[in-house]
A protein has these predicted regions:
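Glycine-rich helix-loop "coupling/hinge" segments at transmembrane-helix boundaries
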Residues: 192-219, 304-308, 478-505, 538-542
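Alpha-helical transmembrane segments of integral membrane proteins
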Residues: 241-276, 362, 537-541
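A short amphipathic helical element positioned immediately N-terminal to and/or at the very start
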Residues: 18-27, 310-320
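Membrane-water interface segments at the C-terminal ends of transmembrane alpha-helices
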Residues: 1-15, 29-143, 171-192, 196-198, ...
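Polytopic alpha-helical membrane proteins, predominantly small-molecule transporters/carriers
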Residues: 35, 157-158
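Juxtamembrane inter-helical linkers in multi-pass membrane proteins
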Residues: 159, 251-265, 301-315
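Short glycine/proline-centered loop/turn elements that form peptide/ligand docking sites
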Residues: 145-149, 432-436
């Protein structure tokens, strides 16, 4: 309903469906410029993420490098860390006042322009943020490649590059298209990185422009903002539609069930390849995390980091003294937790429909799964604007307002993150025999009894995994809640952003460091839990 109201507000005029609101929005100078910047940053960051993510996936998926599981886990952490925290970490890692660079004696000159406050900085960090997404998609596809073809080519004397060019790449072509589309759409809707790096460089993207207009003028500009939001949503949906069309036309019938990773011998080059992987992990994960931590451990930003300046006062401030941060931690834990639980239940119901033998149930499940994928492709700020349009007035009949409450944030999370909860459940459902449900139905068991006695016990671990993934995503996010939070209803993401935007850099760093530790801890817990789950449920387990 909220998205339908957004379409109505952005695509109608005097009761008639028309593109005039979008054309009127494009008449201003700021909207076309922001549109070009959005497409520019999404395209080039998606391209870089595709190249890097595919190369890493090929190395881990096809060669005999050691510690594949550890490398996979570490490479996926940047994807789970929210974009605004990534931006803050890199700002503090590369700037003239960076405690880390000052300690190493290689900091830029004081007063010089930050190197990341530029178009290149936005594209670079978007690439780092979405490279793990491409890596994950391509690695999963590599596990489904028929090993017999690759091994036969190797036995016949084909060199690794020939195998890659003649067998692997042609089979992966549709997957590479899909991976690029996912990276493109993710970058298109990204708010945290373009806001923190693009605003100082006057490189404004559409999500940032939407936020600026609503933050400056409030609900009075909802109609014009709805047109821009509808344009952004239309672009995202069009990209996904093109992706699905290309995938449907490009058939790869040799793709099969998941198999253990291949191990083409690298010989004497293996230590070099492993060193390059370790350097990549150090550059994309260790460097920004160390920079974030050193900033959090100094009393004031700009003070050199050494044994005499180290202090834990910033951590004490955000964890024990600041009411706004305590409230934000509590709010995010509550809302993300409830959203995860609700989506686990919904995902189990959708999974049951997808696994049913009756065509009606399967069609309903397919429709809901498609809707979930489409909603996930829509930028979070667009979803938040849709919920503002839907709930800015009290709900009819009951006359209760949820605007400016945690409820509206929670409902937006349910809408935005259903696809995340659904993926582990559908992976587990693919391994169930529909005959179990059919036998219970023939025996007279009703729907809820079949769910409770048969389906739920088998799928519950995968649903729990999906709930944890939703919690990980929603706990730190800012894209959805940036326009929905209010005083007393702050989230972790909005509080960190407000600290950084207000100049409280050390507090922002301390709070960001806490969220990074919490994210990694939850990922480790899910990894341990994933040992008892079917393959494909926990994304990074290979």
């Amino acid at each position: 309903m909220p998205l339908a109201l957004l379409a109505r507000a952005g695509l109608t005029l005097d009761g008639a469906v028309t593109l005039q609101p979008i054309l009127d929005a494009l008449d201003s100078r700021s909207v076309p410029r922001a549109l070009i910047n959005s497409l520019d940053s999404a395209f080039f960051s998606g391209l870089i993420a595709l190249v890097l993510g595919t190369m890493i996936a090929l190395v881990i998926g096809l060669t005999d490098v050691r510690a594949k599981g550890i490398f996979t886990f570490l490479l996926l952490i940047p994807m789970m860390v929210p974009p605004h925290v990534t931006a803050i970490a890199w700002i503090q890692a590369m700037g003239p006042s960076s405690p880390l660079l000052q300690m190493l004696g290689i900091a830029p000159e004081p007063g010089s322009t930050h190197p990341l406050y530029s178009r290149g900085g936005v594209i670079a960090l978007l690439s780092i943020q979405h490279m793990p997404l491409v890596f994950l998609v391509v690695l999963a596809a590599l596990r489904a490649l028929p090993r017999e073809m690759i091994e036969a080519a190797r036995i016949a004397g084909a060199r690794p590059l020939a195998v890659l060019r003649r067998i692997v790449v042609p089979l992966l072509a549709p997957i590479l298209i899909s991976a690029f589309a996912l990276a493109f759409v993710s970058a298109l809707g990204n708010f945290g990185i373009p806001a923190l790096l693009g605003i100082p460089a006057r490189y404004t993207t559409l999500p940032v422009l939407l936020w600026q207009r609503l933050a400056s003028f409030g609900p009075d500009v909802l109609t014009s903002v709805a047109a821009i939001a509808a344009l952004l949503a239309a672009i995202a949906i069009a990209i996904i539609a093109v992706q699905m069309t290309l995938l449907a036309r490009t058939r790869s019938p040799l793709i099969g069930p998941p198999q253990p990773p291949l191990a083409i011998r690298l010989g004497a080059r293996r230590p070099l390849v492993e060193t390059l992987l370790a350097l990549l992990v150090a550059a994309t994960l260790v460097l920004p995390v160390v920079a974030l931590t050193t900033t959090a451990l100094i009393p004031t930003y700009g003070v050199p980091f050494n044994l005499t300046t180290i202090t834990f006062a910033n951590f004490a401030e955000v964890l024990f003294r600041q009411q706004v941060t305590l409230r934000a931690f509590a709010n995010s834990t509550l809302v993300a937790g409830l959203a995860g639980l609700m989506l686990a239940v919904i995902a189990m119901a959708v999974g049951h429909f997808l696994n049913a033998r009756q065509k009606g149930y399967r069609r309903a499940g397919t429709a809901l799964a498609t809707l979930a994928e489409t909603t996930y492709a829509i930028p979070g700020l667009v979803i938040s604007i849709a919920f503002i349009l839907a709930f800015i007035r009290p709900i009819p009949v009951i006359d209760v307002s949820i605007y400016n409450t945690l409820i509206i944030i929670g409902l937006a999370y349910v809408c935005a993150f259903l696809s995340i909860a659904l993926k582990p459940v559908t992976a587990a459902c693919a391994q169930l025999d529909p005959a179990l449900d059919e036998a219970a139905r023939i025996s007279g068991a009703r729907f809820f009894m079949r769910m409770r006695r048969i389906f739920a016990p088998l799928i519950a671990p995968a649903a729990a995994s999906g709930a944890i993934l939703v919690f990980l995503t929603a706990y730190n996010e800012i894209t959805v809640s940036a326009l929905l939070w209010s005083t007393g209803n702050e989230t972790i993401g909005t509080t960190i952003y407000n600290y950084e935007d207000g100049g409280y850099t050390t507090l922002a760093a301390a709070m960001s460091a806490v969220t990074v530790v919490a994210t990694i801890a939850l990922m480790v817990a899910l990894d341990r839990f994933g040992k008892r789950l079917p393959p494909g449920v926990v994304p990074w387990r290979i």
